[in-house]
Structure formats: structure tokens, C-alpha cells
Amino acid sequence: MFCFQCEQTAGCSGCTGAAGVCGKKSVTADLQDELTGALVGLAHACMNNPKTEQTDRIIIEGLFTTITNVNFNDETLREMIARVREEKGRVVPGCAACMSPCGNTSDYDMKRMWEADEDIRSLKSLILFGIRGMAAYAYHAMVLGYTCLLYTSDAADEED
């Protein structure tokens, strides 16, 4: 386990071992990394293939699920991983049957990020945590029925 995304981080350097200061277990941290890697794989799949109507929603929900202290339920994380992989199958049908894996839709191994040069790791972590933060706002907006920035403009004040 390696986690350093919250203010409770042990010694201001990250939690390691069997559990974090916040109570997150090592297995849960691994599942969050697996979910993040699956989300990266789905994003790669969408680079050259059209998304479905649900793709963005699943990505936002998946990112929100990995935010600190949002969800430490291992079964929920496993279900979200399965949903992300199922969505990838809809975006790129038949990819799993390909005899020549190209790597364009593979899940990303988060260990590569955590074991990268510290400057690269820091930059990628900053980007990831920022995207997760934006996903939190987007997730709550979706739950409330908002779908775009149009609602922040004067157009939202106009009556139909």
C-alpha cells in the first residue's frame, strides 16, 4: 500500500503497510489503484473509438469513487471496476478477442506511476488528484441533474 492523497497522511510522506491512518486497508488501496488503471484503459479506448452515452458518467463516477474517504467498500470498488471494463467492451467491441493485443485499451498498471521518478510521480499525482477533485464536482452536478456549463450562464435564467 502507498497512499498520500489526504491530510491524514502519516508523517507527511504517505501511508504504507497494512492500513492508512484514515483506516483504509491495503486491499482497498490496491482496488482503488486497479479502478484508476481501468479508468485509464477506458480513456485510452475512447481516444480512437466513439464513446457511448454512458462513458463519461462511468468515468466521473469511477474517479469520484477513488477520492479519499468516499468509498472504502471493497465490493463496491470491485463492482465499479467491472462496470468500467464492461464499458470498455462496449466502446471497443471485440477487442478482448483480438489475437494481437495493441495495448491501446489495456488497464494501466498504477505501480508504474508509483514507482516512477519522483518528479514524474509528483506531476502525474497532481494531475490525477486534480481530475479526481473535478470529478467530485461533476458527480454531484450529475446527481442533481445538471449536465453542462450552460447552467452557469444567463441562459439558465431564461424561462422557456
Where are these regions (language model features)?
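Cys/His/Pro-rich metal-binding microdomains
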Residues: 4, 16
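Cys/His-coordinated zinc-binding microdomains
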Residues: 7
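Short, non-ligating residues that shape and space the ligands of small metal-coordination modules
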Residues: 12-13
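Charged, amphipathic alpha-helical linkers/stalks
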Residues: 31-46
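Long, low-complexity or tandemly repetitive, helically biased scaffold regions used
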Residues: 93-115
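Boundary segments of small protein-protein interaction reader/adaptor domains
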Residues: 123-131, 135-145
